């Protein structure tokens, strides 16, 4: 019985480990497809020259996610939808859902100071290496 339980836990762990890269690979594939669709249909999307959409002033895209998706909604509502554009906006919606699910993890449980400091150090390292620091 104990061996069966251990095998079950081992199988569950293997499923979890395999699911994470698959989800990440799926998201990467979705983003690549969306970039291709955006590039392909850019002219069609630019059709409404009078439409104005807010564009964040700085390049730290992580800080402007809400503004980016508000712009996507504006563009979607003001653009004549065809099948190709429907796929583009559907992909963008799926990407937003993924980001929203990830944001829910921000309010995790309280932990010890050392764990917070480790997280803070990692956060600052990301800012230092991946973000465009503006003056």
Curated annotation (Swiss-Prot):
Entry annotated with the keyword Signal: yes
GO molecular function, one term: growth factor activity
GO CC annotation terms, alphabetical: extracellular space
Segments crossing the lipid bilayer: none
InterPro entries assigned: 4_helix_cytokine-like_core, IL-5
Superkingdom of the organism of origin: Eukaryota
Signal peptide: 1-19
Main location class: secreted
Glycosylated residues in this chain: 48, 77, 91
Keyword Disulfide bond: yes
SUPFAM superfamilies xrefs: 4-helical cytokines
Pfam families tied to this protein: IL5 (PF02025)
Gene3D superfamilies listed in its UniProt record: 1.20.1250.10
The entry's keywords: Cytokine, Disulfide bond, Glycoprotein, Growth factor, Secreted, Signal
Subcellular location: Secreted
GO annotation, biological process: immune response; interleukin-5-mediated signaling pathway; positive regulation of DNA-templated transcription; positive regulation of immunoglobulin production; positive regulation of podosome assembly
Subunit structure and binding partners: Homodimer; disulfide-linked. Interacts with IL5RA. Interacts with CSF2RB.
Family note: Belongs to the IL-5 family.
Function: Homodimeric cytokine expressed predominantly by T-lymphocytes and NK cells that plays an important role in the survival, differentiation, and chemotaxis of eosinophils. Also acts on activated and resting B-cells to induce immunoglobulin production, growth, and differentiation. Mechanistically, exerts its biological effects through a receptor composed of IL5RA subunit and the cytokine receptor common subunit beta/CSF2RB.
Annotated protein name in UniProt: Interleukin-5
């Amino acid at each position: 019985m104990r061996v069966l339980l251990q095998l079950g836990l081992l199988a569950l762990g293997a499923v979890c480990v395999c699911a994470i890269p698959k989800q990440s690979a799926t998201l990467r594939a979705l983003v690549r497809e969306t970039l291709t669709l955006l590039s392909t249909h850019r002219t069609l999307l630019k059709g409404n020259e009078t439409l104005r959409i807010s564009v964040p002033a700085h390049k730290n895209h992580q800080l402007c996610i809400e503004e980016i998706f508000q712009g996507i909604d504006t563009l979607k509502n003001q653009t004549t939808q065809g099948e190709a554009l429907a796929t583009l906006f559907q992909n963008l919606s799926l990407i937003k859902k993924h980001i929203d699910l990830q944001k829910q993890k921000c309010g995790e449980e309280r932990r010890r100071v050392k764990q917070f400091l480790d997280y803070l150090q990692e956060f600052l390292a990301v800012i230092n290496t991946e973000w465009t620091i503006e003056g």
